[in-house]
Amino acid sequence: MFTLKKSLLLLFFLGTINLSLCQEERNADEEERRDERNVEVEKRILPFVAGVAAEMMQHVYCAASKKC
């Protein structure tokens, strides 16, 4: 009976360590995915912002030079 308890305790301990390592790996993977999403959002937003800024500069130049 004592040997069985030792074996079960050892299995429980090893399983707990294994689960904690998996959790750390999962957290690292989720962090990488969040970084990738931020880069994707930046890639989509930057051209839009650049286009709006260019158009505003044209309007400002047109109003300042009064050539429109």
UniProtKB/Swiss-Prot annotation:
GO terms for biological process: defense response to Gram-negative bacterium; defense response to Gram-positive bacterium. Antimicrobial peptide. Residues 1-22 form the signal peptide. This is Lividin-1. GO terms for cellular component: extracellular region. Keywords: Amphibian defense peptide, Antimicrobial, Cleavage on pair of basic residues, Disulfide bond, Secreted, Signal. InterPro entries: Antimicrobial_frog_1, Frog_antimicrobial_propeptide. It comes from the Eukaryota. Disulfide bonds join C62-C68. It is found in: Secreted. Belongs to the frog skin active peptide (FSAP) family. Brevinin subfamily. Expressed by the skin glands. Residues 23-42 form a propeptide.
